[in-house]
């Protein structure tokens, strides 16, 4: 919660996106805007608060006394490293003692499975994991970080059982409120890449998350 209260997200996103506004989007949603059936509108969630005093108070209430906070990242994905560097600066401004551990991606993936080896790590979630709320890693008790909060898991179980779209959306709205109250994961926003395709390539679907070459051909 202190981390969530402390950070000023826009300069972080802007820096990571190379200063290009078309390559980032500020959004508190756990689902992306490209999936409107799950994109909620809940004003007042504690996201991008930029509230240093609140962050300091939360650290004090938690009994934090400057112990090293192990934050894993990697330079193999430059955007992750940039996220970590600027976040580190902002967190240290409110009293965190950040031990930034820069490792290769394979080591990060291995170490993140052992909660004794770190306190937080950088990562990103692709749109393929967002098509339904029951697929979201960030609210899963089985994914590194282990969002095992009882209320979050109760809502996820209800989402898995419910078939009425309106009731499922209401549950997903409720999940956002609980998620931001518990703050198991810190949501920054959305990043976008740039993809170039020759005019001779036909049948390629630009809207999917990762490259697929099924039914793609060259027309020369």
Question: What kind of feature is each model-predicted range?
Answer:
Residues 83, 89-141, 171-172:
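Periplasmic binding protein-like
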Residues 1-14, 152-169:
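Extended ligand-binding regions for polar small-molecule ligands
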Residues 1-35, 83, 178-187:
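Periplasmic-binding protein-like
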Residues 14, 61-79, 120-124, 163-199:
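Bilobed periplasmic-binding protein-like "clamshell/Venus-flytrap" ligand-binding domains
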Residues 2, 6, 15, 58, ...:
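Generic, well-ordered alpha-helical scaffold segments in large soluble proteins
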Residues 33-53, 111-117, 134-163, 191-220:
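Short, solvent-exposed loop/beta-turn-alpha elements that line the ligand-binding surface or hinge
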């Amino acid at each position: 919660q202190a981390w969530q209260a402390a950070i000023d997200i826009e300069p972080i996103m802007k820096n990571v996106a190379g200063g290009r506004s078309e390559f980032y989007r500020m959004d508190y949603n756990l689902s992306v805007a490209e999936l409107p059936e799950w994109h909620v509108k809940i004003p007042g969630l504690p996201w991008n608060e930029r509230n240093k005093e609140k962050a300091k108070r939360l650290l004090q209430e938690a009994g934090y006394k400057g112990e090293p906070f192990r934050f894993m990242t990697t330079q193999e994905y430059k955007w992750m490293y940039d996220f970590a560097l600027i976040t580190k600066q902002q967190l240290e401004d409110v009293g965190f003692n950040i031990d930034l551990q820069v490792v290769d991606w394979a080591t990060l993936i291995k170490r993140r499975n052992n909660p004794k080896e770190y306190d937080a790590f950088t990562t990103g979630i692709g749109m393929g994991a967002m098509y339904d709320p029951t697929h979201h890693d960030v609210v899963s008790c089985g994914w590194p970080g282990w969002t095992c909060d009882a209320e979050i898991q109760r809502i996820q179980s209800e989402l898995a059982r419910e078939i009425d779209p309106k009731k499922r959306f209401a549950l997903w709205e409720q999940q956002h409120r609980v998620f931001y109250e518990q703050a198991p994961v810190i949501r920054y926003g959305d990043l976008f890449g740039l993809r170039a395709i020759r005019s001779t390539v036909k049948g390629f679907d630009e809207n999917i998350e990762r490259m697929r070459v099924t039914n793609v051909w060259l027309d020369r």
